[in-house]
Amino acid sequence: HLSEQLGHEVSIRELARGEHTVLTAPITVACASSGNHGRAVAAGARHFGCQAVIYVPGDTLEARAKAVESEGAKVVRHSGTYDDAVRDVETTARDEGWVVISDTSWPGYEDIPKTVMTGYTVMAAEALEQMIALDAPRPTHVIIQGGVGGVAAATCGYLAETLPDDYPT
């Protein structure tokens, strides 16, 4: 988004220093989440000077919604399911000019989820690096939280590419 506006790649360092606050302040990022992803999007928005609107499904625990709010986001409690919230945030974001930051894709919206999932692979890479540093045996199994499947899919994909001959189940 900013890179397109500025005509050059914007670094995390530039954003963290607040070098583009004039441009980031009017940006609103949004997503549907029942907790962790929404909290991370809200924290990132706060850190980079953006606004965040997080749609939470009706069955989201109040403590999780409060945790998202604690990062400075506006929380919109949706009466429906997670999938309903995803559809509504996409529609509202399009109407309002917000940027959706989701790890769930749909036709025509693949780039940001791909980037989010690439970011998830950092956890798998760090875990594997620690195992190697400790001279630990390669993992035979991986157990990871499910959520909507983004972290699990990214982890499995990373391990399949990194350990093609010794892939854990």
Give each language-model segment a name.
Residues 8, 12-56, 138-151:
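A short, small-residue-rich loop immediately preceding and capping a beta-strand
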Residues 1, 68, 167-169:
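Internal hydrophobic scaffold segments of catalytic domains
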Residues 53-141:
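Small/polar-residue-rich loop-to-helix segments that shape phosphate-bearing ligand pockets
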Residues 27, 50, 73, 98, ...:
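A structural micro-motif
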Residues 1-29, 111-132:
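Glycine-rich oxoanion-binding loops at beta->alpha junctions
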Residues 23, 94, 163-165:
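Short, structurally constrained coil/turn elements
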Residues 138-140, 147-148, 153-169:
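Acidic, glycine-rich loop-and-beta core segments that form the ion-binding/anion-interacting portion
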Residues 1, 41-44, 48, 152-163:
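Short Gly/Thr/Asp-enriched flexible loops that form oxyanion-binding sites at enzyme active sites
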